[in-house]
Amino acid sequence: MTNLRKTHPLMKIINNSFIDLPAPSNISSWWNFGSLLGVCLIIQILTGLFLAMHYTSDTMTAFSSVTHICRDVNYGWLIRYLHANGASMFFICLFLHVGRGLYYGSYMYLETWNIGVLLLFAVMATAFMGYVLPWGQMSFWGATVITNLLSAIPYIGSDLVEWIWGGFSVDKATLTRFFAFHFILPFIIAALAGVHLLFLHETGSNNPSGLSSDADKIPFHPYYTIKDILGVLLLILVLTSLVLFSPDLLGDPDNYTPANPLNTPPHIKPEWYFLFAYAILRSIPNKLGGVLALVLSILILAVMPFLHTSKQRSMMFRPFSQCLFWILVADLLTLTWIGGQPVEHPYIIIGQLASILYFLLILVIMPITSLLENNLLKW
């Protein structure tokens, strides 16, 4: 009798994706982040579901409903901080996952990569709307500043902003619709992640060498299931440590003050995971130019496959490209730091230089260096 997992229509899908899937024998821990992102998404959906049971999306009661969750609901504080810090873990895994893709040339799988870029945008949109929901000072002003950026779009801009707001300012209508979208988007993300996996399994995983691994495959289970479980345990360890010891480490104290449209906080800034893009936005004095730079800072990932000039897929055997990759990482960390600083000298010029370097590295320096490496290797 044939094994049920190989014949049952539902079990067969699970079997071919997580059990009998042929995987390269040499993929490192950098390949763990896909499964970690799946775990993060499950954590976020579950904690979010329980928060939604007690949350009210009304400007008058939103802030106090979050306070009620923390004070009166059984383990409400735990659920709330798991959700807030779970988002931070989500983005840490996302950035490492994308970084791995850039380093090892995973972007050569076009469909998988493009769905991934779409997923990144969807997660960023979800996180932004989630940050608005507690209706603290930074929630309100963050929503006001970021939605206002759309007014830079010629002709339709101001109408578009009022349409998104559902009025003439960020108010009840905005909060209600943001809650609705924040609730539905994670399920769309889950569906997109399924498509992401579907396309990945059409080609099979890449590996650190960037060479074909068809001659040397091993079954996903038990080898990589065990490896993924170790990753998940480490993720949960870091998340619970953060939640139980310093839950507000990555948050903004201003968000513990109820939203007040008449009082602007001295420094409006988003959560840490958006700071690099926020720094790029601020480094351009022109509003439309800043918005374009902001969008392009993420959208530039979609053109990575077309900027690949090397004869080798991975950076494993390309020391010059490796140096440039780590300069790019340092540049992004610099941008993240600048995004959290006030707009004054010397932060302005540092931010502008870091923004120029970011685009120069990706669009010009790295492709030229790859061509140079081809010539050095006489390929």
Curated annotation (Swiss-Prot):
GO terms for biological process: mitochondrial electron transport, ubiquinol to cytochrome c. One of its GO terms (molecular function) is ubiquinol-cytochrome-c reductase activity. CDD domains: cytochrome_b_C (cd00290), Cytochrome_b_N (cd00284). Binds 2 heme b groups non-covalently. InterPro entries: Cyt_b/b6_C, Cyt_b/b6_C_sf, Cyt_b/b6_N, Cytb/b6-like_sf, Cytochrome_b, Cytochrome_b_C_euk/bac, Cytochrome_b_N_euk/bac, Di-haem_cyt_TM. PROSITE patterns: CYTB_CTER, CYTB_NTER. Keywords: Electron transport, Heme, Iron, Membrane, Metal-binding, Mitochondrion, Mitochondrion inner membrane, Respiratory chain, Transmembrane, Transmembrane helix, Transport, Ubiquinone. The chain crosses the membrane at residues 33-53, 77-98, 113-133, 178-198, 226-246, 288-308, 320-340, 347-367. The keyword Transmembrane applies. Pfam families: Cytochrom_B_C, Cytochrome_B. It is a multi-pass membrane protein. Gene3D superfamilies: Cytochrome Bc1 Complex, Chain C. It comes from the Eukaryota. The keyword Protein biosynthesis does not apply. A ubiquinone binds at residue 201. Heme b b562 binds at residues 83, 182. Heme b b566 binds at residues 97, 196. Its cofactor is heme b. It is found in: Mitochondrion inner membrane. GO terms for cellular component: mitochondrial inner membrane; respiratory chain complex III. Belongs to the cytochrome b family. The cytochrome bc1 complex contains 11 subunits: 3 respiratory subunits (MT-CYB, CYC1 and UQCRFS1), 2 core proteins (UQCRC1 and UQCRC2) and 6 low-molecular weight proteins (UQCRH/QCR6, UQCRB/QCR7, UQCRQ/QCR8, UQCR10/QCR9, UQCR11/QCR10 and a cleavage product of UQCRFS1). This cytochrome bc1 complex then forms a dimer. Component of the ubiquinol-cytochrome c reductase complex (complex III or cytochrome b-c1 complex) that is part of the mitochondrial respiratory chain. The b-c1 complex mediates electron transfer from ubiquinol to cytochrome c. Contributes to the generation of a proton gradient across the mitochondrial membrane that is then used for ATP synthesis. Heme 1 (or BL or b562) is low-potential and absorbs at about 562 nm, and heme 2 (or BH or b566) is high-potential and absorbs at about 566 nm. This is Cytochrome b. It comes from Sorex excelsus.
